[in-house]
Design a protein with these regions (language model features):
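Intracellular loop-helix junctions on the cytosolic face of multi-pass helical membrane proteins
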Residues: 1-8, 12, 16-177, 181-186, ...
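Helix-loop junctions at membrane interfaces in 12-TM secondary transporters
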Residues: 1-7, 15, 236-249, 255-265
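Small-residue hotspots at the loop-to-helix junctions and early N-terminal turns
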Residues: 40, 187-195, 290
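Residue-level signature of mid-helix packing/kink "hotspots" within the transmembrane helices
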Residues: 47, 51, 198-206, 261, ...
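Transmembrane alpha-helical segments of major facilitator superfamily
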Residues: 110, 192-201, 296, 342
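Helix-to-loop junctions at the C-terminal end of transmembrane segments
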Residues: 117, 203-219
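Structural signature of the two symmetry-related core transmembrane helices
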Residues: 219-234
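A late C-terminal transmembrane helix in Major Facilitator Superfamily
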Residues: 280-313
Length: 389
């Protein structure tokens, strides 16, 4: 209960940081190209930060890893539980203290990085407030703004497609370590395989930024996210092979980069479209971003629930050196069949997303014309007022 309460508080505080941090994209520039570039830089650094955090956590906590439990076929579930208790008693006095200290040190290091990055963000980033031409005299209430946002068709289609593709990659991410350890038999290699995925994602985000600029965002979504499908199928169809696994890891990282970058890059276009349809509504950018963050947290929880229940029903044995065949089949489904189905469903929903490159250019021109018209009107009013004085 203590852990649950403090973990919920931690997630709440992280969300309170993540929502305004993400929404800052709309306030650092009015140019779509500059916002896309800022999003690419942000996602590159986020993925790089994930790699750094994984490396720090792994190096500190990895030294306190407890051994696996041998579970031969004749060992019953009760005997297996007894074996776990015996090993726990044998290693309890030393391993528990070492593990606690390792996690405390890792938490201190990561917490310090959180504070440092938050200070740099607060001090180093300046907002560009929207000029008066797109602002009404009285702001629209939060609840009316929420209703307008949730009735905006382009936003609903985008977050729905984002929901399914995010769930696919979170299932892959959450179960890939177990898949490498038990199904493929690469117990000593899975950390390097995960590192290959994240490094591949980090290095290919600039490529996807160029690709979406050259060919459009919807095309980039289809090419980028769907590119993982054949490799996810190959990794479970072919026999266990370390080289093929690394190739799949690199390919998955390329697709993960697209899944990280593209939905966040498309969101400012939706907000511009919303502004044109509802010029009287202002200051609701945080609503768009907060529901994006909400769906990220939601898919993370759903992914964890699906994985935990599926593995429990299959007979997963905690800390076992090997697993029943049912667990291996379940892991294959969780890292291949289910993600592929979710990706295809998400891409189908992205097909319904109405803002293509032509529509995006039209919105950009309309917003620019609106600003120029308002600026001209403001200058005329100022000149008239000066003449009167």
């Amino acid at each position: 209960m203590w852990y649950l309460i403090f973990y919920c508080i931690f997630q709440t505080l992280v969300t309170c940081f993540h929502v305004p941090y993400s929404a800052l994209t709309m306030f650092i520039s009015r140019e779509q190209s500059e916002r896309d570039s800022a999003t690419a830089y942000r996602m590159t650094v986020e993925v790089l930060g994930t790699v750094l955090g994984t490396a720090i956590q792994g190096q500190i906590v990895g030294k306190a890893v407890t051994p696996c439990i041998e579970n031969p076929p004749f060992l019953s579930e009760n005997n297996f539980s007894a074996a776990i208790r015996n090993v726990n008693m044998t290693h309890y006095s030393g391993s528990l203290a070492d593990t606690r200290n390792a996690y405390m040190v890792a938490a201190g290091v990561i917490g310090g990085l959180y504070i440092l990055c938050a200070v740099i963000l607060s001090v180093g980033v300046r907002e560009k407030r929207e000029s008066s031409e797109l602002q009404s005299d009285e702001p629209v209430s939060f609840f009316r703004g929420l209703k307008l946002v949730m009735n905006h068709g382009a936003y609903i289609k985008l977050i729905t497609g984002f929901l399914f593709t995010s769930l696919a990659f979170m299932l892959l991410e959450g179960n890939f370590a177990l898949f490498c350890t038990y199904t493929l038999g690469f117990r000593n290699e899975f950390q390097n395989i995960l590192l290959a995925i994240m490094l591949s994602a980090t290095l290919t985000i600039p490529f996807w930024q160029w690709f979406l600029t050259r060919f459009g965002k919807k095309t980039a979504v289809y090419v980028g996210i769907s590119s993982a499908v054949p490799f996810l199928i190959v990794v479970v169809v072919l026999d266990s092979n370390l080289v093929i696994t690394y190739i799949v890891a690199v390919a998955a990282g390329i697709s993960v980069a697209a899944a990280f970058l593209l939905p966040w890059s498309m969101l400012p276009d939706v907000i511009d479209d919303f502004r044109l349809q509802h010029p009287e509504s202002r200051g609701h950018e945080a609503i768009f971003f907060s529901f994006y963050v909400f769906f990220t947290k939601f898919t993370s929880g759903v992914s964890l629930g699906i994985s935990t229940l599926s593995l429990d029903f299959a007979g997963y044995q905690t800390r076992g050196c090997s697993q029943p065949s049912e667990v291996n089949v379940t892991l294959k489904l969780l890292v291949s069949a289910v993600p592929v189905g979710l990706i295809l469903l998400g891409l189908l929903l992205f097909k319904l997303y109405p803002i293509d490159e032509e529509k995006r250019r039209e919105n950009k021109k309309a917003l620019q014309d609106l600003r120029e018209e308002s600026n001209s009107s403001s200058e005329s009013d100022s000149t008239e007022l000066a003449n009167i004085v």
